[in-house]
């Protein structure tokens, strides 16, 4: 189980994924608008299933905010 933390302080602009979705490495999960107005893509470097989404659109977040929980795949995919 992997917590997905916010990479910055800001506001959740858009939630792209849903609970129970299988996501791939580096797939966009959410968009956060930081304090300077820049849109930050949130992704994670492992694949798995989103077991919990802990935020909603418009919510204020900071680097300690757990955005979602991912159950990592037991097998890896990769490319060289």
Predicted regions located by residue number:
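Short beta-strand-turn/beta-hairpin segments enriched in glycine/proline and small hydrophobics
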Residues: 1-9, 28-47, 72-77
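Preference for bulky hydrophobic residues occupying beta-strand positions
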Residues: 15, 30, 42-44, 53, ...
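Short, charge-rich amphipathic interface segments used for partner binding and complex assembly
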Residues: 44-63
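Hydrophobic alpha-helical membrane-insertion signals
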Residues: 16, 54, 62, 72-80
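A structural signal for short beta-strand/turn segments enriched in small hydrophobics and glycine
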Residues: 20-29, 58-67
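Short histidine-centered loop motifs in beta-beta connectors
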Residues: 7, 13-21, 51-56
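Short phosphate-engaging motifs
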Residues: 11, 22, 49, 60, ...
